[in-house]
Amino acid sequence: MVIVGIDAHTRRHAAAAIDKHGRVLEVIEVGAGVEELDRLIAWITALGSTRLVAVEGAKGFGLALTRRLLDAGERVVDIATHLTADGRRSSRRRGKDDEIDAITIARVAMREPDLPRLTADQLDADLKLLVDARDQLVAEATRVRNRLHALLLVLAPGYRDDIAALSSKASLATAKRLVMRGRAAEPVRAKLALAAIRRLHELGRQADDLEVEIKSALAARQPTRLLAVCGVGPIVAAKILGETRGVERFPTAAAFASHTGTAPLPASSGQTTRHRLNRGGNRQLNRALFTVAMVQARWNPDARAYLERKRAEGKSPTEARRCLKRHLAKVVYDAMRADAREARIRAAA
């Protein structure tokens, strides 16, 4: 068994091959261009038939390389940067450079057998791109809305009596009328406010167009079980699928929960058994599960009963919600596994 560790960067990638005992076989460094990536893949192929490739930054600087590795049929796992840092600290070889990191990445993969494998599911990759683009538009709209709010406080004091929130087309139309009234006294502020209103309309149209694309891409995926979960609408489902990148990468629901940051971390010592909050994991998935938990806490009787049981056990409201998120991680995992099985059946038919 040969394990290849790759430390990916914007301009160059360092790769190290080790055997099953952790001994270094060979180290290579290549550029990030297409020809250099092909040379790296050819080098990996020549190492033998049984191999595993571990990439740090597989979804970042190493994304182009990872896609080519998957297209070439390689088994690829993603190594989180904190695992590399932990491995480097525990090594007898001190210091840090790309070669040391590549060797460390390979050794991390050797001792961590349950690392999630990467897949070449283009539908999930497209969902992530679309959802990320929409999230950026929504975030920009929030910033523009805040600027407009600050301008309206001077242009139209007390404007909140007429406008509850600067979110709908009707509210923006009312805001425009208020701006026009105060235009003579504050021409510069009025000009900036009108530009902000135009920008909000534009961002809204772009976000709506992306939502249509997201729903279309989601329909091709047919996640019927996932969408049946209370609180999981099209946008949340697309976020979960895009960030998960193939549920079958995770052998168990516990592994998925750990990836989402909803599984508490053991912090026991001696006779004391306790757990602490997990602040790691994929925070986008964690956020999506938080959204589902908040919806269920309001509308799902089973979720409300679950929260009441946790409160009766002595947990605080926040702790009870964390327990619900951990429970929902399993519910979502099971739903995605069921959808994946149905997709395989459809493909085989």
Language-model-detected regions and their locations in the chain:
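Gly/Thr-rich phosphate-binding beta-strand-loop-beta motif of the actin/hexokinase/Hsp70
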Residues: 1-19, 105, 137
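Short glycine-rich, Thr/Ser-proximal phosphate-binding strand/loop in the N-terminal lobe
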Residues: 10-35
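Short, basic/hydrophobic alpha-helical segments
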Residues: 35-52
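Phosphate-backbone recognition surface of nucleic-acid-processing proteins
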Residues: 37, 228, 234-235, 239-317, ...
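Short glycine-rich phosphate-binding loop at a beta-alpha junction
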Residues: 49-61
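Short alpha-helix plus adjacent loop in nuclease-associated cores
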Residues: 77-117, 125, 129, 136, ...
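Glycine-rich, often acidic, oxyanion-interacting loops/wings at catalytic, nucleic-acid
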Residues: 129-225
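Basic, amphipathic alpha-helical segments enriched in Lys/Arg and hydrophobic/aromatic residues
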Residues: 312-347
